[in-house]
UniProtKB/Swiss-Prot annotation:
It is found in: Plastid, Chloroplast thylakoid membrane. It comes from Barbarea verna. The gene is atpA. This is ATP synthase subunit alpha, chloroplastic. Produces ATP from ADP in the presence of a proton gradient across the membrane. The alpha chain is a regulatory subunit. It catalyses: ATP + H2O + 4 H(+)(in) = ADP + phosphate + 5 H(+)(out).
Length: 507
């Protein structure tokens, strides 16, 4: 028979009473009324914020977007196949936020900042709200430093500055992504952190971009945020904001960042899908009334910060897809009105073999020459003028057979200048090479060559100047000006190479 010791029992009871924690945790819970198509309606979530994260019984996370008198409309950030009618939901009290750190560089992540490249977890000690307010007027300064894309047509005639927002717009398959990825490649060694956001694209297309960046060593300073076409609409809608939060982290740490949204048409479609399923009233083209605000609050986060905040910058290159060149559709007009200019890519030019297929006539940069170095300003003005005159003459020349010599010369010059703007993909040029190329064209050195010889000659000229006249590049990179000395070295180099080239071609 076991003897019961009363003092031992009383000690145990006393210990348990002392250890008893009277803390009460109050959890705000609700019940699922209806679920389907990536949307759930919840009853009983009393104190929930707009945009708050809610957690379902089986672990799926959702965002409360519609707060109505008798229920809450939630968009699901997962497939939600295990959610049932009547299952419980709890409010987390948090607005969507992501961890941020330097460790994200070189990684491929999803809209919730979880890695999807199979290379393990990413360590981060800080976090940022996905939706944070844009810098105010006092926090900014005007754009004055160039962000070189490596594409002659853009850097000379549609210059982009650090902190600018420049739209890349065009039909499908006109090389929009190629312009954006070339810009990333050109930031090598420029201390610019790049963020590429892929929204609603094929997984194979994203893999192709990532492979291209890895092969050329550009992933070292790049973060890829990807939500492919099979991702829930809520995640496709969130992806650009996640990218912006990561870029802001670096911007506020006095660094320069470049962010590419590829593309905002797909984000608008995902947002339209969510809004219609939440039964929000449709507007033009069935988009909800606040689709302008969707893009404006995203693009306003790009800025050039004031000297008090460390002069960091975030340059945005949003991409928008048009249908058969219609720039007057709803989303294109919205984004054009928000951004500081647009680069228009034309399917006709692309099919005619002019690549990058930039229509210089209707492309514009509202920052202009403030975002160019002096050397580029010196040569670009003449290029713009001559190309504009050429475009006018070309249209006129189609109806006239007998043209005077001056007109024929101008047309010949224009054709060679157009040839000079052609570039292969993934072959960005340094600003010194661009200045030299434009100078060669606008000063008539290409006029004696056949159109088919122009690109071959320019490639050889760049190599020749790099090896035999390195002082030209040194002067431009140190003074940022095409000085008289640099010009005489350049003239000498062009003439020497031209003689050699013509001799080679004769043989």
């Amino acid at each position: 028979m076991v003897t019961i010791r009363a003092d031992e029992i009383s000690n145990i009871i006393r210990e348990r009473i002392e250890q008893y924690n009277r803390e009460v945790t109050i959890v705000n819970t609700g019940t699922v009324l209806q679920v389907g198509d990536g949307i759930a309606r919840i009853y009983g979530l009393d104190e929930v914020m707009a945009g708050e994260l809610v957690e379902f019984e089986e672990g799926t996370i959702g965002i409360a977007l519609n707060l109505e008198s008798n229920n809450v409309g939630v968009v699901l950030m997962g497939d939600g196949l295990m959610i049932q009618e009547g299952s419980s939901v709890k409010a987390t009290g948090k607005i969507a936020q992501i961890p941020v750190s330097e460790a994200y560089l070189g990684r491929v992540i999803n809209a919730l900042a979880n890695p999807i490249d199979g290379r393990g977890k990413i360590s981060a000690s800080e976090s940022r709200l996905i939706e944070s307010p844009a810098p105010g007027i006092i926090s900014r300064r005007s754009v004055y430093e160039p962000l070189q894309t490596g594409l002659i047509a853009i850097d000379s005639m549609i210059p982009i500055g650090r902190g600018q927002r420049e739209l890349i717009i065009g039909d499908r398959q006109t090389g929009k992504t190629a312009v954006a990825t070339d810009t990333i490649l050109n930031q090598q060694g420029q201390n610019v952190i790049c963020v590429y956001v892929a929204i609603g694209q094929k997984a194979s297309s994203v893999a192709q971009v990532v492979t291209g960046l890895q092969e050329r060593g550009a992933m070292e300073y790049t973060i890829v945020v990807a939500e492919t076409a099979d991702a829930p609409a809520a995640l496709q809608y969130l992806a650009p904001y996640t990218g912006a939060a990561l870029a802001e982290y670096f911007m506020y740490r006095e660094q320069h960042t470049l962010i590419i949204y590829d593309d905002l048409s797909k984000q608008a479609q995902a947002y339209r899908q969510m809004s219609l399923l939440l039964r929000r009233p449709p507007g033009r083209e069935a988009y909800p009334g606040d689709v302008f605000y969707l893009h404006s609050r995203l693009l306003e986060r790009a800025a050039k910060l004031s000297s008090q905040l460390g002069e960091g910058s975030m340059t945005a290159l949003p991409i928008v897809e048009t249908q058969s060149g219609d720039v007057s559709a709803y989303i294109p007009t919205n984004v054009i009105s928000i951004t500081d200019g647009q680069i228009f890519l034309s399917a006709d030019l692309f099919n005619a073999g002019i690549r990058p297929a930039i229509n210089v006539g209707i492309s514009v940069s509202r920052v202009g020459s403030a975002a160019q170095i002096k050397a580029m300003k010196q040569v670009a003005g003449k290029l713009k003028l001559e190309l504009a005159q050429f475009a006018e003459l070309e249209a006129f020349a189609q109806f006239s057979s007998d043209l005077d010599k001056a007109t024929q010369n101008q047309l010949a010059r224009g054709q060679r200048l157009r040839e000079l703007l052609k570039q292969s993909q993934s072959a960005p040029l340094t600003v010194e090479e661009q200045v030299m190329t434009i100078y060669t064209g606008t000063n008539g050195y290409l006029d004696g060559l056949e159109i088919g010889q122009v690109r071959k000659f320019l490639v050889q000229l760049r190599t020749y100047l790099k090896t035999n006249k390195p002082q030209f590049q040194e002067i431009i990179s140190s003074t940022k000006t095409l000085t008289a000395e640099a010009e005489s070295v350049l003239k000498e180099g062009i003439q020497e190479q031209l003689e050699r080239f013509l001799l080679q071609e004769k043989l």
